[in-house]
Amino acid sequence: MEFSDELLASLRDARHIAVFTGAGVSAESGIPTFRDALTGFWENYDASTLASPEGFAADPALVWGWYEWRRTRVLRAEPNPAHYAIAALAADCPRLTLITQNVDDLHERAGSADPIRLHGSLHHPRCSACEAPYRLPPGIPDEPEGGRRVDPPRCARCGAPVRPGVVWLGENLPQAAWDAARQAAEDCDLMFSIGTSALVWPAAQLPALVARRGATVVQVNPAETALDGHAGYNLRGAAGKVMPLLLQALRRSRP
């Protein structure tokens, strides 16, 4: 894959790069996306019901079991070349802000520090009533391949069931994370949008905000998305292939 001189110059000259990642990045590590069909124990359930406050209120064991199954899948997965290239890019620019819609920890395991998590984390549950954080036991849960119902633990402070630390459908994004993401979008010289459909709002407005400011948007995606018209560069391909090649080209282009 070849990259234009203009793109490489924009990367070299950027004082602040923002990287916005979606489910497509984690999918290359074998993590199912939210739109993938459910399998095993979950095949007769709707993900939009499981990922909702109403679903948890109706059947906490069903919802907690689904998220423990998902967390198990994540902990058994490994970061892919896109995760590592994004982490390495931080050492090649004055400032890099990583914003992710993903709820796994693959960015951190690849070496990225302090990503802004718009949709929360599978690894940081909290009390469903008083919101006290709950510390998960170390290691990988002993969950069957197909999944199962699991009663959620109880909060040590108030006794209410612990809930997954993610943003469910209908819930607001964490205000601090959203404010930090918007600030990065308003300040950066260049934003990568990688592996995201650009359909999930309000997060999807971040690249469009960058484009409206006249800053550069670079989209990395194997398929067309709603962002195509806003992006200055559309790099077609899997992030795990495109990002390492782009990082190599950037380093070769430096004097």
UniProtKB/Swiss-Prot annotation:
It is found in: Cytoplasm. NAD(+) binds at residues 22-42, 101-104, 195-197, 221-223, 239. Its EC number is 2.3.1.286. SUPFAM superfamilies: DHS-like NAD/FAD-binding domain. It is an enzyme of class 2 (transferase). GO terms for cellular component: cytoplasm. The lineage of its organism: Bacteria, Pseudomonadati, Pseudomonadota, Gammaproteobacteria, Methylococcales. Pfam families: SIR2 (PF02146). It catalyses: N(6)-acetyl-L-lysyl-[protein] + NAD(+) + H2O = 2''-O-acetyl-ADP-D-ribose + nicotinamide + L-lysyl-[protein]; N(6)-succinyl-L-lysyl-[protein] + NAD(+) + H2O = 2''-O-succinyl-ADP-D-ribose + nicotinamide + L-lysyl-[protein]. The keyword RNA-binding does not apply. Zn(2+) binds at residues 127, 130, 155, 158. Substrate binds at residues 67, 70. This is NAD-dependent protein deacylase. It comes from the Bacteria. Its cofactor is Zn(2+). Residues 1-253 form the Deacetylase sirtuin-type domain. NAD-dependent lysine deacetylase and desuccinylase that specifically removes acetyl and succinyl groups on target proteins. Modulates the activities of several proteins which are inactive in their acylated form. Keywords: Cytoplasm, Metal-binding, NAD, Transferase, Zinc. It comes from Methylococcus capsulatus (strain ATCC 33009 / NCIMB 11132 / Bath). One of its GO terms (molecular function) is histone deacetylase activity, NAD-dependent. The active site is at residue 119.
